[in-house]
Amino acid sequence: MKENSDNQFIQVVSCNTHNISCITNTIAIKDFGPDNLKEGRFMCIRRANDTSQSGNFIAAPSVGVHDDENFGSHHAKDSYDLFSTLGYDLNMFSSAMKVNSQYMHVLWFYLKTKEAVTLNDVLDRLHANDLVATTSKNMTSTVFSFGRDHGHFGRILNQTVVVEQSLHVKNDHEVYGYCFTPQDGNSILSSISATEHFLYPHSFEDKVQCLSELFFEEI
């Protein structure tokens, strides 16, 4: 949200859009500015439904369509709109599909940067963001189980969980990787922050720090 904004309503974007936005900002934009992102490409591999739901499960993977001519699925469009509130005009495109799982969404990402970057640079940027968790686990079931056992009411509040060994840098400018989406958890944190912003516009950032102990560095 912009400072000194007169907005009475806000949109809290989806959990996958949170993930896309966090990864893009952390790796490509923060400390460099929006011009550092040449392009961002994303594949949202979505779970079929939540473990609490008895309906809408699918028997096999199902691919989505590209509804938007410029952005593909709504995820990149929503992330673009989010960054546009800061005056950024980003080159983003996403695709989406569902798989027959109830655990977690998976995000594949490709970020091309203007400035050269190394794998160690990427890791340092991810580790410097308190809202990013990293993991050596490569299955959604084991990360989901960790959240169930150790998360706040079973939820992971981090914006994303990056699989470290999946990260790859090509030609000094192209970053590839996979990360898991803490569905509900990351958008819940944004909802709390937005509410605090309305109530305490000048001190909301300090007030939400009471939740910082609920963020994981490593899963």
Regions found by a protein language model. Give the residues of each.
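Long, low-complexity C-terminal extensions of enzymes
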Residues: 175-207
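N-terminal Rossmann-like NAD(P) cofactor-binding subdomain of oxidoreductases
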Residues: 1-54, 194-198, 202-216
